[in-house]
Every structure is written in C-alpha cells, then in structure tokens.
C-alpha cells in the first residue's frame, strides 16, 4: 500500500516558498544501523550484533503497527544514492530545506534508544544519537538544530545527558515521546524536567513511543489508522498528567512543545480540566491555578498535522484560545503525512500571525536570532 504517490520529478518542480520558515519537526534517519557504531563503545557493537535491542512493547525491534510505507515516509523521499528516507543531508537540502526556504530546522530523531528495556544500552544509544546529530547534520548545515535524545525511563541518567549538552548551540530542545512506561507527570521523570529547566531547554513531546502498554485506554486497536488518530488521545493523557502532577508548579520556567498530534483538542481538554479542578481541587492542592492557565503558559504546539474543519473560522477559534504566539510550523518531513508549506494555512491569516507561525514563534522559543 502506497500512501504518498507524488513522484520525485513533481516534487522538484513545485514552486519555491518565498517565506522564510522554521520547520520544527524534521526526522533524520540513519543510512544503516551500523552508522551509529563510531559513536558507541565496542562492547555495544558486540551486544547489538548478538542480542539486538528489546523494546518495552515486545522482544522484537520495530513498531507494532506497520506504517503502510517504509519508515512511514514519502515514496519520493528515497535519496538517489540509496538508503532510507531522511538519511541524506544533500537530498534533504535539495528536496525540502532549500525550496521551502527553511532557515531553522529542528531534528527529532526517532527509532533511537528510547523505550529500550536495557537502560545502559538505551543511555549509550541516546548519547550516540546526539553525537551523530552533530557529526552528520548540524555541523554540516547551520540551519539544522538537534534535539537532546534521552533514555527517559532512567530519569537520573537522562538528566545527566541533558546537562552534558547544556549550552551546546547544536541543540535547542530535549526530546521525549508521548507513550512511556508511565504518564509523563510521574516523579520518575522529574529529574529530566529539572535538568531541562536548568539548561534553559524546552522539551518536545513527540507523538508515538511504546512503553509496553496498549496504545489506547481500552486495549489494542485493529488498524494503523486508529493508531494515527490515537496520537491526540495520548498527548492529552500526557498533558493532563504533567499539569495535575504539579510539574509546572515545581518547574515554573519549563516549556514544552506538543509535537505531531494536532491541537484542535486543546481547548476542550482545558475546559474539562478546569471544570473538574473546580470541583476536585482539594485532591490536588499543589495545582494552584486552573489547569488551562498552565497549558496556555507553558505549552507550544506544532501545526502538523493541522486539523482541517469545513469552516476555517472554527480553526481560527481554536488558535485564538491557544494563542497565535504558541504555534510552531512543522512539516514532519519526510513522513507520508508531510504538510506542504505553501498550502498548510487557510486564507484569512494576517501577515503578522503568518510570520509568527512560520518563523517568529520558533525563533523566540528556541532562542535563535
């Protein structure tokens, strides 16, 4: 089954985007599994060859739902020199960065050390991925900035990796996933938030991840489409946990980005949280303000995948609640549900809001002049 059918010649012929933009969700890939070996101690080479990796969702590496396309990516994104989509800097520049006038691209590497049962291996792989981002990507193209990937189930070790990268201009955020062993507000993850706040780094919470639990609240669904729709449900769970466990009271300077789960659900979640907090606030005395206030103050949102209601004023109502200053443009390149920059926004967006969404908000959040 092929999801994205545009041929490479068609993509190359598309008109270039004149507006300078930040793409806050780009997925780089390794050309081969061994591409990470130069950044790993030799003991891990032997370990990976003999035992491979064992994620929480089972004893085999890989997602439980096939993605309909290899790596969930566009068919036209295969590099001409070979390798998986997203593994070639030169082709990424030619197909995406240059024609779309991307002046800031935030890398979110997936299929890394997150979610591995062996915590020592997970930490080693995450550190290697961070070195790999510098060596292969950010040092070769100054437009690209990395995300500090951490083995988040070991909060203390993850915090050490964040502090190791603090102040390194190659990195602009910490990367977590939305599905973990426990909801993200749990105390096992607090060392990560403490270190991120110390480093002045926002945390990107990317939809996906496998903590060994069913991916819905009622079990395992039948279809990939259900997993896709379920990304927003999982992000809601993560965000409610962060607010109600008091993370933003404890770490008042911490900012987070909800990545690749839409944002149309944000107002209704805020309303429901506020209503229940008014009635049950004695259970959570550490939550000192209405939950929606924490969401509006501490949370940014990537546009991709943007909701597409029949009436665009409905979309604008949602954004007005969130705030135009809290939206970050993202394409999800090279994945199949990529948002075309020249077509993503409906008519009626003011020039000021358009500039903020495409570039200004990202520069402010990530401290890029």
Task: List each language-model region with its residue ranges.
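Divalent metal-dependent hydrolysis catalytic cores, especially in the metallo-beta-lactamase
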Residues: 75-82, 97-119, 143-149, 172-176
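Short catalytic/ligand-binding loop motif for oxyanion handling, primarily in non-cytosolic enzymes
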Residues: 28-32, 105-107, 113-119, 155-158, ...
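Active-site flanking residues adjacent to catalytic metal/cofactor-binding acidic residues
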Residues: 22-24, 205, 259, 330-331
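Mid-to-C-terminal alpha-helical segments outside catalytic/metal-binding sites
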Residues: 2-20, 30-99, 103-104, 131, ...
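Catalytic pocket-lining loop regions of alpha/beta-barrel enzymes
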Residues: 137-145, 150, 156, 161-321, ...
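Active-site-proximal gating segment of KS-fold condensing enzymes and close homologs
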Residues: 120, 124-136
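Short, surface-exposed alpha-helical recognition segments that flank or form part
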Residues: 84, 121-124, 153, 231-235
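Aromatic- and glycine-enriched glycan-recognition loops and surfaces
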Residues: 83-91, 126-131, 182-191
């Amino acid at each position: 089954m092929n999801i994205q059918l545009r041929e490479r010649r068609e993509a190359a012929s598309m008109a270039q985007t004149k507006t300078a933009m930040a793409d806050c969700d780009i997925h780089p890939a390794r050309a081969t599994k061994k591409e990470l070996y130069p950044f790993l101690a030799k003991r891990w080479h032997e370990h990976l060859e003999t035992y491979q990796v064992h994620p929480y969702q089972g004893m085999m590496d890989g997602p439980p739902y096939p993605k309909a396309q290899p790596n969930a990516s566009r068919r036209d994104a295969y590099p001409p020199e070979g390798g998986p989509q997203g593994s070639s800097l030169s082709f990424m520049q030619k197909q995406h960065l240059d024609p779309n006038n991307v002046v800031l691209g935030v890398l979110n590497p997936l299929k890394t050390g997150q979610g591995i049962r062996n915590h020592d291996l997970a930490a080693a792989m995450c550190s290697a991925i961070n070195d790999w981002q510098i060596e292969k990507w950010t040092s070769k193209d100054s437009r690209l900035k990395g995300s500090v990937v951490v083995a988040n189930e070991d909060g203390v070790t993850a915090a050490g990796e964040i502090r190791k990268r603090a102040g390194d201009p190659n990195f602009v955020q910490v990367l977590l996933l939305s599905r973990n062993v426990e909801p993200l507000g749990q105390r096992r993850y607090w060392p990560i938030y403490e270190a991120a706040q110390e480093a002045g780094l926002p945390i990107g919470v990317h939809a996906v991840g496998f903590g060994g639990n069913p991916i819905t609240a009622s079990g395992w669904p039948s279809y990939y489409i259900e997993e896709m729709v379920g990304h927003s449900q999982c992000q809601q769970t993560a965000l409610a946990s962060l607010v109600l466990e008091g993370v933003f009271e404890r770490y008042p300077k911490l900012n987070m980005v909800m990545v690749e789960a839409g944002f149309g659900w944000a107002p209704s979640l805020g309303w429901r949280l506020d209503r229940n907090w008014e009635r049950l606030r004695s259970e959570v005395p550490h939550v000192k303000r209405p939950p929606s206030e924490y969401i509006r103050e501490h949370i940014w949102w990537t546009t991709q995948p943007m909701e597409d209601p029949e009436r665009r004023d409905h979309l604008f109502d949602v954004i007005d609640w969130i705030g135009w200053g809290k939206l970050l443009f993202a394409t999800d390149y090279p994945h199949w549900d990529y948002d075309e920059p020249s077509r993503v926004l409906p008519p009626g967006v003011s020039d000021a809001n358009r500039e903020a969404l495409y570039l200004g908000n990202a520069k402010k959040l990530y401290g890029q002049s």
